Amino acid sequence: MTPLPPPSPSAGPRAQWLDWSGLRLLIIENERIRLVLWPDHGADLLEFRDLASGLDVLWKNPQVWPPRAHALDQPHAGRSEFYDTFHGGWFVSLPNGFFPADYFGAPLGCHGELQSVSWTAETTEQSAAAVRVVLTGRGVRTPWQLTRELVLHANEPVVRWREHLLNRSPNRLPVAWLHHPAFGGPLIEGAELVTGARTLITPPADRPELAQLQPSYRGAWPLAPEQATGVLRDCSRVPPAGSSLEHVVHLTDFPVGWGAVWNQARGLGFGLRWDESFFPYAWSWAAGRGHDTYPIWGTCHTVTLQPSTSPLLPFDRLVATNQVRWVEGGASLETQMAAGFITQRTAILDLAARPAAPTSST
């Protein structure tokens, strides 16, 4: 697998551009962490690296690495246009959540259009105290516009951001909004998923023969019954690499919106913090190797924690049951998140970023 270039020593917070493997990438870094973003493809995060350990926490799909921006010139069926570019990493799903949908006449693929359109990127602040970058993606088939402001302070292992979703149409419209970070690499080996969720729900199975857990089950996190045996599976444990274990669950009833992948042997983890009133669900997909056939071919060792406005259901069902966010014409939604490395198992990240000192822009 072709790796991204190694980090260079950083004297402080900074943003810089990198040309790599035909891609134009944006690096945001400080003394503790490095983020690599791909603005031309949904502002995807390709790398989130702890510089002290050298560990990159984001999963790389070996079938689609280096990343590719466009679907293959081949027949398409069964979400193949998405899987042609599914490199792993971290992307946003808007406005239809996971499932393909007819969005008021606009055909949208798996995970929506904002994860595939080109975004603009501007460094609005860079100093010894902090670097601030603003990225904006505009829908082509839908009237949604998402603006993301990332802030990284000096000597902190955490990045914080605000997201502003604007409905550019005059119409009241529904939206299912999901963040999709996929974790992989050495940090998830022998790791556990730690979260404040009280409740676990297994989704209805569109292909019951592939579901390892009992579909449509609701119970206390982290246990869910296996479909074949009824034995309770601890869904907080990341499946061992190469094993056939795989499951999809969504979590809810969060007193505080937070979760982490924690590796006790390394004394290191990666945490997320979000507004639990805005994202009341978090989906988690965990796999030791994934399906042995298309689209993963047994090469996927990953675990995800995906804050979401909605449960894992087709978009038309979400709308019919009012499990979406509604936005008036010309109005917007705003939320904030934080993500970064932790050295305590139950460390909860500070959601609010402290204001940066006045600086000159670059």
Report residues per predicted region.
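Surface-exposed acidic/polar loop and edge beta-strand patches at domain peripheries
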Residues: T2-R160, N171-P174, L178-T362
